[in-house]
């Protein structure tokens, strides 16, 4: 039996959806204002610039004329690390999601927000949307900064750029969710700082961000493929240099699994967090 169209129910559903979106946007704006300041913005520029133009060219002198293979293309080390810094910077920027929740817990702001017409799921989604926006802005910034270093090798198309876009978004979701999980479990500031720093160092250096995994010892090379940053960086590079192939789609699928799993765990962690 077909159901009759109920205009009142449809109108109510529309209003509820509008309120949901409005609440999330309000929290996103609040998160962006709270998490970004002059020091944060300067660091987002200075850190990748130092790695690209100091570390990149210094290591290039050691490597010599040997290129690094990405797909069917041989690129310079400066191009390699410039593209790698996009994923690395996304990981660093994603820390704002955990920082927001950590500070809200300590300052009692989380309780105040829940008294207002905001739900826990809206809180999580808004934190991740803010993280994605910062991640995309960071990626665009690194591309602009690294353009002189990558100019001779870069080969962007709309199709390949979409892979880089997906890598940045999925990477932001994973690392944003990961920092949310840590912030809900850790009790002290000292432990929060030590654990965050240690884990992010592991993510950074047991990955393909700074060097190709093919030349690493076997155990380290295998470990890097359990690291989501490896997939973020690989997909980003393959998009930047138009070296997308069937394996890139497999990497996207694996990254989706990492990101969706982390998001589910982060949502449950917030739902169980005591006010």
Model segments located where?
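Aromatic- and glycine-rich beta-strand/loop motifs that create alpha-glucan
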Residues: 2-49, 108
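Membrane-interfacial helix-loop-helix junctions in multi-pass membrane proteins
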Residues: 34, 155, 207-261
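Hydrophobic alpha-helical transmembrane segments of membrane proteins
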Residues: 71-100, 167-172, 177
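Transmembrane helix segments
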Residues: 57-63, 183-226
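Transmembrane helix boundary and interhelical loop/hinge segments in multi-pass membrane proteins
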Residues: 93-118, 275
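Hydrophobic alpha-helical transmembrane segments of multi-pass membrane transport/permease proteins
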Residues: 23-25, 36-64, 78-93, 136-138, ...
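Alpha-helical transmembrane segments and their short interhelical loops
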Residues: 120-196, 201, 244-269
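Junction motif at the cytosolic side of a transmembrane helix
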Residues: 2-8, 62, 240-243, 253-275
């Amino acid at each position: 039996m077909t159901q009759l169209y109920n205009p009142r129910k449809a109108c109510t559903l529309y209003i509820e959806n509008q309120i949901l979106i409005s609440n999330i946007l309000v929290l996103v704006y609040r998160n962006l204002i709270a998490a970004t300041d002059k020091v944060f913005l300067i660091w987002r520029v200075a850190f990748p610039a130092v790695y690209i133009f100091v570390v990149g060219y210094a290591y290039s002198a050691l490597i010599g004329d040997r290129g690094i293979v990405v797909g069917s293309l041989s690129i310079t080390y400066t191009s390699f690390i410039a593209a790698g810094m996009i994923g690395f910077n996304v990981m660093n920027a994603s820390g704002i999601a955990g920082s927001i929740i950590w500070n809200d817990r300590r300052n009692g702001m989380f309780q105040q927000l829940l008294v207002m017409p905001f739900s826990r799921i809206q809180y999580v989604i808004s934190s991740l949307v803010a993280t994605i926006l910062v991640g995309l802005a960071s990626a665009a910034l690194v591309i602009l900064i690294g353009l002189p270093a990558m100019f001779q090798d870069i080969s962007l198309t709309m199709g390949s750029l979409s892979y880089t876009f997906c890598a940045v978004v999925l990477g932001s979701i994973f690392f944003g969710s990961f920092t949310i999980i840590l912030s809900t479990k850790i009790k002290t500031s000292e432990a929060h700082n030590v654990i965050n720093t240690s884990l992010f160092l592991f993510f950074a250096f047991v990955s393909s961000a700074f060097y190709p995994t093919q030349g690493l010892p076997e155990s380290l090379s295998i470990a890097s493929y359990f690291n989501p940053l490896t997939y973020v960086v690989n997909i980003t590079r393959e998009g930047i240099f138009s070296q997308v192939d069937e394996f890139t789609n497999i990497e996207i699928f694996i990254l989706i699994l990492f990101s969706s799993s982390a998001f589910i765990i982060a949502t449950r962690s917030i739902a169980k967090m005591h006010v």
